[in-house]
Curated annotation (Swiss-Prot):
Homodimer. The active site is at C174. The keyword Transferase applies. Belongs to the thiolase-like superfamily. Chalcone/stilbene synthases family. Pathway: Secondary metabolite biosynthesis; flavonoid biosynthesis. One of its GO terms (molecular function) is acyltransferase activity, transferring groups other than amino-acyl groups. GO terms for biological process: flavonoid biosynthetic process; polyketide biosynthetic process. InterPro entries: Chalcone/stilbene_synt_C (IPR012328), Chalcone/stilbene_synt_N (IPR001099), Polyketide_synthase_type-III (IPR011141), Thiolase-like (IPR016039). This is 5,7-dihydroxy-2-methylchromone synthase. Catalyzes the iterative condensations of 5 molecules of malonyl-CoA to produce a pentaketide 5,7-dihydroxy-2-methylchromone. It comes from Aloe arborescens. Gene3D superfamilies: 3.40.47.10. Keywords: Acyltransferase, Flavonoid biosynthesis, Oxidation, Transferase. Optimum pH is 6.0-8.0.
Length: 403
């Protein structure tokens, strides 16, 4: 009988196996789907709804301040998975600090994978291949932590095969739309034939609470965040005539800006998610973003452009001030952030799902205008995620010709 060592492959055979396991090409975005809840809230009347729902109408001056905050956001409307009648069932959620985590979990644990599944179904339909061909699922959310986790529940709702490789990314915040693309690139390029379904789904009820004069940070968050989900199909070596790749994911980098963990931070408590934001966050991000951009270009041997206007842009719309200051710092023309500002106006800040919406907005408008590429007619672009840490995700994209 042969020994175990004699039956195993030689080192050169192992290298051959390794080479065969890897894809030949770069990971690409092949399909995009989005979904949002049915309840729409216009921003210009949101202060009335919010103060009424939280029994806070007697706080007249605070309401005026909140209304002013809402009107400065450059948000037109947002979507939520609740309305006023729904909130009446949960008085602890609409208080400021009553224990309410159980109620919030009861809403988010089933709601997050359900909303994510809606977006995933649209992405799979656009992709055009059977869902049985999905090999990996990456699910991302900042709410509804549970076991089995949201990736398991989404796979179950979609009816994916039992051997799909699943990953769940919890509690990363607003930069996570970039994080999931970084994960998906590694999975697609290191597993020949892999097709990665990426799902980001967010429900903001985890941080909804009554206004409080001593915690205006939370009120700012409540004026910005909206509910939504985005899904992408990512894979290498697209099948010609079947799959329609739009963007190549050329390089991904994550950077933590030193000594900034107190600038944006959130904490899960019995009262839900508590949100804290420094006034200096837009400046901190804008002062560091160019270094992140230069790093991602140099890491692949490309000289950074002298004029950042030569690129298309997918920045996370963390808020008007962040977009304004990054735009100014990089000396970008106003139209460069058009897609991001459109998504911010139409949906608010949907945390990890936002950049998926912006990719969708950009590719649709590019097609409608008859441009040469999905990236507003340009070949090269950048996707940026900003969030707690402060963490920056920088992704170098190469847009393919419109098909």
């Amino acid at each position: 009988m042969s020994s175990l060592s004699n039956s195993l492959p030689l080192m050169e055979d192992v290298q051959g196996i390794r080479k065969a396991q890897k894809a030949d090409g770069t990971a690409t975005v092949m399909a995009i789907g989005t979904a949002h809840p049915p309840h729409i809230f216009p921003q210009d009347t949101y202060a009335d709804v919010y103060f009424r729902a939280t029994n806070s109408e007697h706080k007249v001056e605070l309401k005026k301040k909140f209304d002013h905050i809402c009107k400065k956001t450059m948000i037109g409307k947002r979507y939520f998975n609740y309305d006023e009648e729904f909130l009446k069932k949960y008085p602890n959620i609409t208080s400021y600090d009553e224990p309410s985590l159980n109620d919030r979990q009861d809403i988010c644990v089933p709601g997050v994978p359900a909303l994510g599944t809606e977006a995933a179904v649209k992405a799979i339909e656009e992709w055009g291949r059977p869902k049985s061909e999905i090999t990996h699922l990456v699910f991302c959310t900042s709410c509804g932590v549970d076991m089995p986790s949201a990736d398991f529940q989404c796979a179950k709702l979609l009816g994916l095969h039992a051997n799909v490789n699943k990953y769940c990314i919890y509690m990363q915040g607003c930069y996570a739309g970039g994080t999931v693309m970084r994960y998906a690139k590694d999975l697609a390029e290191n597993n020949r034939g892999a097709r990665v379904l990426v799902v980001c789904a967010e429900l903001t009820i985890m941080m909804l609470r009554a206004p409080n004069e001593t915690h205006l940070d939370n009120a700012i968050g409540i004026s910005l965040f909206g509910d939504g989900a985005a899904a992408l199909i990512i894979g290498s070596d697209p099948i010609i005539g079947v799959e329609k790749p739009m963007f190549e994911i050329v390089c991904t980098k994550q950077t933590v800006i030193p000594n900034t963990e107190d600038v944006i931070h959130l904490h899960l408590r019995e009262t839900g998610m508590m949100f804290y934001l420094s006034k200096g966050s837009p400046m901190t991000i804008s002062n560091n973003v160019e270094a992140c951009l230069i790093d991602v270009f140099k890491s692949v041997g490309i000289t950074p452009p002298e004029d950042w206007n030569s690129l298309f842009w997918i920045p996370h719309p963390g808020g008007r001030a962040i977009l304004d200051q990054v735009e100014a710092k990089l000396k970008l023309r106003p139209e460069k952030f058009r897609a991001a500002r459109t998504v911010l106006w139409d949906y608010g800040n949907m945390v990890s799902a936002s950049v998926g919406y912006i990719l969708d907005e950009m590719r649709r408008k590019s097609a409608a205008k008859g441009l040469e590429t999905y990236g507003e007619g340009l070949e090269w672009g950048v996707l940026l995620g900003f969030g707690p840490g402060i963490t920056v995700e920088t992704i170098l994209l190469h847009s393919l010709p419109l098909m």
